[in-house]
Amino acid sequence: MNIKENDLPGIGKKFEIETRSHEKMTIIIHDDGRREIYRFNDRDPDELLSNISLDDSEARQIAAILGGMVYKPQALESIEMAFSDLIIEWFKVEKGAKSIGRTLGELDVRQNYDVTVIAIIKHNQEKLLNPGADSIIEENDTLVLSGERKHLKKLIHDFLSGEGV
């Protein structure tokens, strides 16, 4: 699958997606939380086949279904309450970040920040699920992180953003 990400200043982000079977869609995530999904004709990319608009809550529920979670509204609500402080965040390693060229073991994010690195999506789209301590972080890698928001923010500031330099 090929995904192109573009900033839309004043609007949000646009993701252009082409699946392995060459089907194309565009997802726009607005700064206010709304999502729009557009599905295009594979033979004529200018022909819109369908579109749908979702609010933030609807998009998250659909993401849970697509992500393979068993969808039961009552169970989902109790999970959200039990893990209200636990979040999963995707963060692209910025130019100049202190983590570039270092291994996960060197950073010891679990011990030092109480954060778990679930996956690393390398800049060439290679996916490392449950990466080991010897996994090297490179500029433009996307890290999938799990932890409390305050711990994630500190890790991102200290090692993943260009701000920590």
UniProtKB/Swiss-Prot annotation:
Naturally occurring in which organism (per UniProt): Bacillus subtilis (strain 168)
Membrane topology type: Peripheral membrane protein
Chain's role: Required for activity of the potassium/proton antiporter KhtU. Involved in protection of the cell from methylglyoxal, a toxic by-product of glycolysis.
GO CC field: plasma membrane
Principal localisation: membrane
Complexes and interactors: The transporter is composed of the integral membrane protein KhtU and the regulatory protein KhtT.
Secretion signal span: none
Subcellular location: Cell membrane
Lineage top rank: taxon: Bacteria
One GO BP: potassium ion transport
Protein name: K(+)/H(+) antiporter subunit KhtT
